């Protein structure tokens, strides 16, 4: 695949900084620079926009085949269809979605259920992708009657970090 565009609400300097430095992978060894409204990643020039209105995105003009919807703000077919109406061929949610999407896929577990007529798909949650492949293997090999997991997650924008009753 080829990275064809990035739409990020953060300003261009922040996008470039976050592309250059990663807390897990360290500093990107190649070139990251800004050139007007383009993000230069080595020799690849990627159009960078900051459009909050999905319906106003120029996916058709840019020839976008697949939008990775990673905001977490959009979770249903209606909002995904805004990307489709803007010219994208398909939408993949990087997070859990509502039940009105074509499928929720956990790679290696139910990948075979994907079909070419699906245009809005969810990749499930990070916890699901960490646990379900292992659990599926255990279930197929030994059988699993019940399971409980505990996940420790970094603070995100949506949970309340303190007891509101205090």
Where are these regions (language model features)?
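N-terminal Rossmann-like NAD(P) cofactor-binding subdomain of oxidoreductases
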Residues: 1-161, 165
């Amino acid at each position: 695949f080829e990275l064809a565009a990035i739409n990020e609400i953060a300003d261009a300097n922040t996008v470039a900084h976050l592309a250059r430095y990663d807390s897990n992978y360290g500093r990107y060894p190649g070139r990251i620079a800004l050139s007007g409204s383009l993000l230069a990643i080595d020799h690849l020039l990627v159009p960078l926009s900051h459009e909050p209105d999905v319906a106003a995105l120029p996916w058709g003009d840019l020839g976008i085949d697949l939008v990775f919807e990673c905001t977490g703000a959009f979770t249903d077919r209606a909002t995904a269809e805004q990307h489709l109406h803007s010219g994208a061929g398909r939408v993949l949610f990087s997070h859990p979605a509502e039940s009105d999407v074509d499928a929720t896929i956990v790679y290696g577990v139910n990948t075979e259920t994907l079909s070419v007529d699906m245009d809005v798909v969810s990749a499930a949650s990070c916890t699901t992708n960490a646990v379900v492949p292992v659990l599926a293997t255990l279930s197929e090999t030994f059988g699993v009657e019940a399971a409980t997991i505990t996940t420790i997650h970094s603070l995100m924008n949506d949970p309340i970090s303190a007891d509101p009753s205090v």
